[in-house]
């Protein structure tokens, strides 16, 4: 998925590198580059891809919440981008540069609650209803009673939230809807394996460079350019750590669990706390959100999603990494012409990160086809065959 959502499709990706903990060679060996193949894993700032950043204040019953958005463009419809679980708005960085060069549009990439730099009173409430309301509230806070035309584009969990937002009519100026690699049937089938996937990820990283390297070599993000900006939004410094210490060799793909001996419980707990502190010192970065704790919301994100998507009375686009992801309802709907679909092969679950140019072409073609936006830079539409 992203972490969480990536696991939904893990077994269906044909050319996936082995994940840490899955028995692949990466899980037991240190990550090393061959001679002459060293790559740059240093993080890249958001400002290389977005024009500006804004913290949008939203008033509610409990006070004020602040939602981080990244923006580009000044004309055309607003493409409101919703990331997948565990990711952040920065996962759209490379896509943003690609789409802005093809059509006249405005980009608003949003950090959903509990993710990225968004700060809310109750960051643990990740229900579909709450997050959909957040999206509507952010649009209202940014544009008032007369918002510009908006197209919702969401990846995985973000795609589900986009559909819930559209179905509840929370964005009155909505003109289009796009889901990226999220299908109810596949998602529901994968619910039982999500916790196992999350347990297989590293818990900490010694540096941002280490986190970026892991994301690429594990197959979470196959595009190094995107990983260098995207992973910054997925990890944070551990609490109580002010600066990274040491410069030890790259951490292995998995932080192996400590073996428990037969000491008394007090001794074990004391040793565990000491070990945790040492781990934080050597590996001061961890995930921004503990996805395992959001399990009670997973079913609500995806159950009934296909029919909800089909029921939205606006032009719709579905982008998939593989045609085998279609469930029965979407297969019938696609045959009936209820939405446009395009398959982008040779991508992982993070389609918009792995192939940002192809996703930008698909979205730009969709916008021009429906006369929602004007092409720029001599962009030529290429209509898909399905």
Curated annotation (Swiss-Prot):
Residues 255-265 have a biased composition (Acidic residues). It comes from the Eukaryota. The modification Asymmetric dimethylarginine is found at residue 16. Ubiquitous. Highly expressed in testis and brain. PROSITE patterns: LIPASE_SER. The modification Omega-N-methylarginine is found at residue 16. Transmembrane segments: none annotated. InterPro entries: AB_hydrolase_1, AB_hydrolase_fold, Epox_hydrolase-like, PPase_methylesterase_euk. Gene3D superfamilies: alpha/beta hydrolase (3.40.50.1820). GO terms for molecular function: lncRNA binding; protein C-terminal methylesterase activity; protein kinase binding; protein phosphatase 2A binding; protein phosphatase binding; protein phosphatase inhibitor activity. Signal peptide: none annotated. The active site is at 156, 181, 349. The modification Phosphoserine is found at residue 15. Its EC number is 3.1.1.89. Phosphorylated by SIK1 following increases in intracellular sodium, leading to dissociation from the protein phosphatase 2A (PP2A) complex and subsequent dephosphorylation of sodium/potassium-transporting ATPase ATP1A1. Keywords: Hydrolase, Methylation, Phosphoprotein, Serine esterase. It catalyses: [phosphatase 2A protein]-C-terminal L-leucine methyl ester + H2O = [phosphatase 2A protein]-C-terminal L-leucine + methanol + H(+). It holds the Pfam family Abhydrolase_6. Belongs to the AB hydrolase superfamily. Binds PPP2CA and PPP2CB. This is Protein phosphatase methylesterase 1. The lineage of its organism: Eukaryota, Metazoa, Chordata, Craniata, Vertebrata. The gene is Ppme1.
